[in-house]
């Protein structure tokens, strides 16, 4: 960065004004960073369109995954849970209905108790909708496809 120090042009003022001049090279660097960010956003949108099946999440991938996608619906379930098995095809279909806009993830609470404990999941099935890594809505128990769709639509951009 290039800084210039100039004497203030009013008489009897003994202070200096520091003026910052942004040079062409700095502008080029800023524009390159913006371009890379835009290219990454486009790449992420294309990747999002290609996700056709729910992602299997675990204690090690959970937080990275919810922060990676702009909108992700996570199903907290267990194999012995009848209502969870009943909801599975509805949740899978929701992912297909909103493909390119929403990612669906599934986390088996029996195999991944750490995340379940951290999020205070006490009943299953529990669905939590994350927007940019933050929980914005949730549903506990068996619900209709329409109810899940309403929740998703409220948070689509």
Segments predicted by a language model, with ranges:
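Hydrophobic heptad-repeat coiled-coil signature
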Residues: 81-84
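Proteins that catalyze or organize thiol-disulfide redox chemistry
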Residues: 1-73, 79, 90-97, 101, ...
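Hydrophobic beta-strand anchors of alpha/beta hydrolase catalytic cores
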Residues: 73-74, 104, 127
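Hydrophobic anchor residue in the Rossmann-like NAD(P) cofactor-binding loop of oxidoreductases
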Residues: 109
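Structural micro-motif
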Residues: 119-130
């Amino acid at each position: 960065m290039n800084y210039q120090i100039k004497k203030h042009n009013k008489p009897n003022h003994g202070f200096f004004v520091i003026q910052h001049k942004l040079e062409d090279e700095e502008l080029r660097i800023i524009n390159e960073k913006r371009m890379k960010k835009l290219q990454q956003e486009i790449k992420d949108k294309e990747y999002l369109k290609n996700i056709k099946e729910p992602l299997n999440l675990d204690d090690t991938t959970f937080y990275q995954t919810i922060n990676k996608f702009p909108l992700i619906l996570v199903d907290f379930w267990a194999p012995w849970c009848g209502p969870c098995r009943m909801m599975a095809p509805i949740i899978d279909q929701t992912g297909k209905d909103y493909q390119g806009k929403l990612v669906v993830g599934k986390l088996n609470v029996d195999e991944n108790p750490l995340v379940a404990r951290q999020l205070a999941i006490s009943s299953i099935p529990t669905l939590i909708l994350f927007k940019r890594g933050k929980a914005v809505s949730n549903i506990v128990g068996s619900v209709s496809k329409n109810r899940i769709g309403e929740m998703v639509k409220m948070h689509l951009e």
